[in-house]
Amino acid sequence: MLDGPLFSEGPDSPRELQDEESGSCLWVQKSKLLVIEVKTISCHYSRRAPSRQPMDFQASHWARGFQNRTCGPRPGSPQPPPRRPWASRVLQEATNWRAGPLAEVRAREQEKRKAASQEREAKETERKRRKAGGARRSPPGRPRPEPRNAPRVAQLAGLPAPLRPERLAPVGRAPRPSAQPQSDPGSAWAGPWGGRRPGPPSYEAHLLLRGSAGTAPRRRWDRPPPYVAPPSYEGPHRTLGTKRGPGNSQVPTSSAPAATPARTDGGRTKKRLDPRIYRDVLGAWGLRQGQGLLGGSPGCGAARARPEPGKGVVEKSLGLAAADLNSGSDSHPQAKATGSAGTEIAPAGSATAAPCAPHPAPRSRHHLKGSREGKEGEQIWFPKCWIPSPKKQPPRHSQTLPRPWAPGGTGWRESLGLGEGAGPETLEGWKATRRAHTLPRSSQGLSRGEGVFVIDATCVVIRSQYVPTPRTQQVQLLPSGVTRVVGDSPSQSKPGKEEGEGATVFPSPCQKRLSSSRLLHQPGGGRGGEAEGGRPGDSTLEERTFRILGLPAPEVNLRDAPTQPGSPEHQALGPAASGAQGRAEGSEVAVVQRRAGRGWARTPGPYAGALREAVSRIRRHTAPDSDTDEAEELSVHSGSSDGSDTEAPGASWRNERTLPEVGNSSPEEDGKTAELSDSVGEILDVISQTEEVLFGVRDIRGTQQGNRKRQ
């Protein structure tokens, strides 16, 4: 399609042609496409054309050329054509990895940079002229193009034409490196982005455009495009908006050209995305200096990223990065140029100068240094940037972890330039540049060794503690309701309890809770069971409850309050229903005794379940994944409870418990977790012991029931 030689000639041939023929005759002779291209350059783009941009890039180019002819110049439209070409060109470049002569590309890139500003100015002038001259002089526009081209030619010496042709060329022909477009991109960026483009391109487009436009050297066509990492989580996201603004936009534009030198110096190393991309789209990723990613010099310095990938470069880039920081932040072109020049502005100057967030600045600094040095050793640069340094460069796939610039990160010191012997002073300067708060806390002190600073937040360990196996205690229920961890003798006195006694037992919160849980869960449990249960819990359990569960007596009472209605009389009735429903209290005592055995047999299930539930709740409160305990508890309750009747009370009891317990225990639980584990073990032991004692003392029936329930 395009005449390869013509385009390949680069800025020179188009430039010459433009100069000689004012871009018309010679071009026509050589190629209609070329002619069209010239016209495109000269002619203003109609708004339609930009809309077409997204369409076929090649078609859009050709159509664009024609459109340019057709469409009169628009005030702002001239720039869009380059823009569109950029998009198409960039996209194509992104897809076509062509090997292009690096030297040529670099030369072009430099030309581009120079021409970019000139062309920008020319374009602005042209645009203004057009606006003033008339809405659309598409035909006149052609002559217009001459003047326009002429200034460009004078300024760029073929930059505009070559750029346009090159845009076309990439479309038509992959071989051409993006150098020219990139050079234009600088101008195009300045122009299209600065003035012509109403809005920023999509993220992808921007990456592509910026990468190709801003980074001729970036394209190693023989290699696949570098991995562009997602924004870093580590970087300061606040930097996004900091530098942004007209100034910033301008900076990106200028920086693209200026940055180009760094890139050029660095070789393809530097892919300079529009700084806006770094701040807006990439966010902190723009800051990711160390990676030679597409946008490798994110944020403030174009040079930085690639240099960082190259270890040596990275180290070198520290100083350059400082310069780059300045340039990237304030005036990328100038500062960058300075930095590239080898001015090691970085440590202090860049910190001061860099409008960029502190992070970008330091990184920029590294990179700038790298860029500058990259110039010195371009060959090294490319490979380093493009080829991950075995040591320094973190794997591309894990971009987030080994941030070269991250203090704790693998390449941090290298990035700083420490790796290459950058003195601590450099590091200090760098650190000074960076706000302390931006440094990862752990990394604030430099770690001398290589390594990756990894924060794994996948799981949070609330507490890890050793829980000893519960110690078995013999709990005997005494008629007095006093729990003694003693022999078996008192256990028999339990049956002697009376309803009154059971009521008395209730007063102790633990007893109440225990008895209520027992009663609730066991209609047959009877007051006797309750009283008995209460007694065991009387002193020890009560204490433990307060101490372990952190349940104040009032809370326990609250729990029991609902339970009690069913517990003393109701439960008594329940047991009575079991066999002594209408009996008098005296008779009930007997029932209680009998049931006490049964209740105890049974109680262990609910009682144990209640305790377990409480424990599990506490544990769940601290560790969300211990839900299984509750499920178990529920099953235990249902299994142990005699009837749905019991279950319902159990449920209510459980709920009540939960409310107060969760509320009260959580504060205390946290502090008492260690104690709790022991206490829980103790409680469970007590329960088991109590069950054993009770079972041994109780009826065979009760024992059987207890066994059943425990099973």
Swiss-Prot record:
Descriptive protein name: Dendrin
Biased composition (Pro residues): 75-84
Naturally occurring in which organism (per UniProt): Homo sapiens
PANTHER family, A to Z: DENDRIN (PTHR16757:SF1)
Coiled-coil regions listed in the entry: 102-134
Membrane topology (UniProt): Peripheral membrane protein
Residues that bear Phosphoserine: S389
Subcellular location: Cell projection, Dendritic spine membrane; Cytoplasm; Endoplasmic reticulum membrane; Perikaryon
Subunit-structure text: Forms a ternary complex with MAGI2 and SH3KBP1; recruits DDN to the cytoplasm. Interacts with MAGI1. Interacts with ACTN1 and may interact with WWC1. Interacts with the podocyte slit diaphragm proteins CD2AP, NPHS1 and NPHS2; the interaction with CD2AP and NPHS1 is direct.
Example GO biological process: positive regulation of transcription by RNA polymerase II
Keyword vocabulary terms for this entry: Cell membrane, Cell projection, Coiled coil, Cytoplasm, Endoplasmic reticulum, Membrane, Nucleus, Phosphoprotein, Postsynaptic cell membrane, Synapse
Stretch list, region Interaction with MAGI2: 186-236
Stretches the record annotates as Nuclear localization: 113-131
Region annotated Disordered, chain positions: 1-22, 49-273, 324-446, 479-677
Alphabetical list of Pfam families matching this protein: Dendrin
Primary gene name: DDN
Residue ranges with Low complexity bias: 150-161, 252-262, 346-356
UniProt-recorded Gene Ontology molecular function terms: DNA-binding transcription factor activity, RNA polymerase II-specific; RNA polymerase II cis-regulatory region sequence-specific DNA binding
Tissue/organ expression: Specifically expressed in brain and kidney. Expressed in kidney glomerular capillary loops (at protein level).
CC per GO annotation: cell projection; cytoplasm; dendritic spine membrane; endoplasmic reticulum membrane; nucleus; perikaryon; postsynaptic membrane; presynapse
